[in-house]
Regions:
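N-terminal auxiliary segments of SAM/dcSAM-dependent transferases
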Residues: 1-19
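SAM cofactor-binding core of SAM-dependent methyltransferases
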Residues: 36-117
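Local beta-strand N-terminus motif with an aromatic residue
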Residues: 56, 127-128, 155
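N-terminal Rossmann-like NAD(P) cofactor-binding module of classical short-chain dehydrogenase/reductase
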Residues: 60, 131, 159
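C-terminal substrate-binding/active-site "lid" region of AdoMet-derived donor-dependent transferases
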Residues: 139-208
Length: 208
């Protein structure tokens, strides 16, 4: 399926136009009826608004999938910003790299083919912004690992997708960002990607 999405984008989207690429991914999803676990257009607006507000220079992403959020993030932040995107699936990395290259954003995005658990301790600088959208049961342990690896600093933003629809998997994560005293955290209601009648939410947590 990921290859079919890429083929559709290459055939229909405008090269070096991130908005056109994202719109065509959305269009493929709606027309095909297949569910793609992108952040999607509705929660994407919340993500863009948060990025514009905080203007991060170093961004970490957990979960690349097909490069949708990498394109959205890289096209929203400034030219001197850089994104590091971690995903354990080689096919996801390959598709994402091609998507990002077609969007003209390869100079701002670095893909790491690894589990977050193995990659995080090897990162050697703090991040201004972390976008979490990978295996839901890994949100909490990987955030703890990020903290232990000293990859966050005061004012760092942690933006977690799907905390509404997967609430049962998010209890430890949400309890930590809301009650540990490390963050000021806000829950923003939205809808599941490409399912406007299904509730979802994002959690935006700022390290204090």
């Amino acid at each position: 399926m990921m290859q079919r999405v890429l083929d559709y984008v290459l055939a229909n989207a405008e090269k070096n136009n991130p908005s056109s690429i994202l719109q065509n991914i959305d269009k493929f999803t709606i027309e095909s009826g297949e569910f793609l676990m992108n952040v999607g257009p509705e929660k994407g607006k919340i993500l863009q608004s948060t990025l514009r507000k905080h203007e991060p220079l170093k961004i970490l992403e957990l979960g690349a999938f097909i490069g949708y959020s990498a394109i959205l993030i890289a096209s929203t932040v400034g030219n001197n910003a850089s994104l590091y995107s971690i995903d354990p699936d080689q096919n996801s990395i390959d598709i994402s790299e091609k998507m990002v290259d077609f969007a003209g954003l390869s100079n701002k995005v670095n893909f790491i083919n690894s589990t977050a658990e193995l990659a995080i301790p090897k990162l050697n600088h703090p991040f201004d912004f972390v976008f979490i959208d990978h295996a839901k049961k890994r949100y909490f342990p990987d955030l703890i690992l990020i903290e232990q690896s000293r990859l966050l600093k005061p004012s760092s933003v942690v933006f977690a997708d799907n905390v509404g629809i997967f609430i049962d998997d998010m209890k430890e994560y949400l309890d930590h960002v809301r009650n540990s005293g490390l963050y000021k955290s806000e829950n923003v209601a939205s809808c599941l990607e490409y399912r406007n009648n299904v509730y979802d939410a994002v959690e935006i947590s700022i390290m204090e």
